[in-house]
Amino acid sequence: MPQTVILPGPAPWGFRLSGGIDFNQPLVITRITPGSKAAAANLCPGDVILAIDGFGTESMTHADAQDRIKAAAHQLCLKIDRGETHLWSPQVSEDGKAHPFKINLESEPQDGNYFEHKHNIRPKPFVIPGRSSGCSTPSGIDCGSGRSTPSSVSTVSTICPGDLKVAAKLAPNIPLEMELPGVKIVHAQFNTPMQLYSDDNIMETLQGQVSTALGETPLMSEPTASVPPESDVYRMLHDNRNEPTQPRQSGSFRVLQGMVDDGSDDRPAGTRSVRAPVTKVHGGSGGAQRMPLCDKCGSGIVGAVVKARDKYRHPECFVCADCNLNLKQKGYFFIEGELYCETHARARTKPPEGYDTVTLYPKA
């Protein structure tokens, strides 16, 4: 029904429009921003705008409607049309009269006939082909109601457990309720489209319960053989099972057994002597595994090592023999098997008279 909504200015208003005469659709509110002025005015998505500030929207385009809304500075007056909504309300009446202290919160019952099911929703009486209605049941059991009659309760001894089994097979969709002395047995076999449960097992359980309640020994039917004894497969399996089987031996074992039985040392043709591979054991005193010894102090070197002319030294032992200057990352000279810096090397190698000493460095 049409109603008028006034939004106080200024913008933004907090709603989104869609439609217009250019879209061949009415102007409809599609979105409301939470906490906005439109939400405070109780505007809802789906409201149809009939007029904006007194101007009808029948001939307005979408852009014209936006311009009308933007032109509203102090307030925006919208005339909207909102569809009716049906809300569920609880039943507060009982027998046509309102009950002040009792509220029934149960919803209205719905008819389930519009659902399509391959199987029965509600159990229906079983009808044997060739008969109009009803079913053949043992005495004292009502197939239509699924409950034993009062006369059957008084004459419990006349009920045979086998008859119950027959009745349950004739009417599988009808629950059977039997009241016996001191016990009440309810048999409700529902539809099983996938054959999840064996009908024979269910019937045997029902017959055993009734027989136990009546104080009788339950008579169970003998299980039928799944494989007929006359089949060829059945006879073949049982014939092989009855015959004693001899132990089987591998081909290599039979060859060795034949050699032992003959007692000859001659090897059969096509065989040769094969020795097992011998694993070589590496010695622990290999050259690569030996610890290098320092050329100066004579102790083993563990960690960083300095090598000069196939001689190993500790980094702290790699010094000049005269001034103990560390020669690492510097030039060094070997004179008579000793290390010297450049200064002391020049002092130890005096050239003949008339010659000067010139230092030559090896090319990298």
From Swiss-Prot:
What is the tissue specificity? Isoform 1 is highly expressed in differentiated skeletal muscle. Isoform 2 is heart-specific.
UniProt superkingdom: Eukaryota
Disulfide bond residue pairs: none
Query: Which SMART domains does this one have?
Result: LIM, PDZ, ZM
Q: Gene3D superfamilies, from UniProt?
A: 2.30.42.10, Cysteine Rich Protein (2.10.110.10)
Q: Does the keyword Zinc apply?
A: yes
Keyword Iron-sulfur on entry:
no
Q: Where does it live in the cell?
A: Cytoplasm, Myofibril, Sarcomere, Z line
Gene Ontology cellular component terms for the protein in this record: adherens junction; cytosol; filamentous actin; stress fiber; Z disc
Pfam families assigned: DUF4749 (PF15936), LIM (PF00412), PDZ (PF00595)
Residue positions where Phosphoserine is found in the record:
S18, S93, S264
> Mind telling me which PANTHER family this protein's record contains?
PDZ AND LIM DOMAIN PROTEIN 3, PDZ AND LIM DOMAIN PROTEIN ZASP
Its name, as the record gives it, is PDZ and LIM domain protein 3
Please report the organism this UniProt entry assigns to the protein. Homo sapiens (Human)
Q: Which gene encodes it?
A: PDLIM3
